[in-house]
Every structure is written in structure tokens, then in C-alpha cells.
Amino acid sequence: MRLNVPISVRYGETDMMGVVYHANYILYFEDAREKYLAKLGFPYADLEARGLISPVLHVECDYGESVRYGDKVVVQLAVTALKPTKVQFRYKVFDGEEIDLDEAKPFATGMSEHCLIRRDDFKPVSMKKAVPELYERYKAALEPDYQ
């Protein structure tokens, strides 16, 4: 399952060169990921209510064309790898005016990997055991060929 999340670039997200500051792409990814979980029917708040959190293990972003203040972009994401202890998302940032995202060249691409830990002691847990319904939803949404 892919999700397209629209983002309007705000002035405060840009740097002295007038383009989106590089670290803000990671915030866009996080915003899209939060909406993805909600779309799966499992918002972050549900994890937190169970005493679980999902920290970033690894994140990367490759930048292409600059995005500027006032631009409308779309962050497209998909789950691309899943293990009982780890989930991987891939992201593409497109021009928000683009109609056919399958043919469009992304402004940026990225990837993040996340685990699941207990909030109280930061010990890792198996998603498959601790939150099997989330694991199954990720599994059903998995797109390993999404690059």
C-alpha cells in the first residue's frame, strides 16, 4: 500500500538559500509515516497507549531538485521490508502538481528503519508478538519492490 501525503512548504522550513533545509525532509517523512499508520488503522497514539514507542534506527535522504517556500509537494511512502523486530519505509518527494507519480522524477528519496521498544525501559520487543495486529497490517501492505 502506498500513501500520498500532501505537504505545503512553510517559510520557516527553508534556509538562507531559500530552499527547504535538508533536515526538514526527515520531518516530512515522519509526518507521512504518522498518516500511514493512521491509514492502517493503527495511529501512534495506540502504540503509546500500550507503552510502546518506535524509534528510528536508520534514516537516509538523497536530494535532487530543490524545493522552495510556497511549493506544494507530495510525500509518497510504502513499507518495503518487514521483520518481527523491524520495519522499513521508503519515501519519494514529488511536485504536488504532478498527476502521474509513477512517471514523475522525485525531488528527493529516502528510507527509514524503525524498531519497537518499551517506553519504560527502552528494551526492544517483537512487533509480531507485542502488537500482532500491526505486524499483520504491515505485512498486508508490504511493497518490497517499491524503490
Description of each model-found segment:
Residues 1-58, 117-147:
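Hot-dog-fold acyl-thioester-processing enzymes
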Residues 3-5, 68-72, 80-147:
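HotDog/MaoC-like acyl-thioester-processing domains
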Residues 11-13, 60-65, 97:
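Short, well-ordered turn and helix-capping elements at secondary-structure junctions
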Residues 36-87, 105-107:
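Hydrophobic beta-strand-centered segment that forms part of the acyl-chain substrate-binding groove
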